[in-house]
Amino acid sequence: MTNTAENANLCGLNRKDFQTTINGKKTDLYILRNRKGYEVAISNYGGAICAIMVPDKDGNVANVVQGFDSIQALMETDEIYRSTLIGRYGNRICKGRFTLNGKDYQLATNDGPNHLHGGNKGYNLRVWD
């Protein structure tokens, strides 16, 4: 990870390490910061929070999340929901089935017999525009 003037940030993440194409969509890293020294680094792949930099009471800035240092690390993690968006539904839908307005729906099951956090194509696996 290198920090150049072009991508200077507190967390030391390099935007180029987050730039690739997944299913025809470009991924990137976005840095949000305020005047008080807070900084959040978010990938548009899964909406993953890669770093949150905040100062302590003495003004020392530190990362307070276990994030990712590249798009590759994010894509290869075994903890697929860590720091990412979940959905359409958060938690489990028993046996992946539910009824809405009298109509029965069967969802993909990805947690044993259950549907978890949006299933096999949840928000954590999407590239957000």
What is the predicted role of each segment?
Residues 2-129:
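Surface-exposed acidic/polar loop and edge beta-strand patches at domain peripheries
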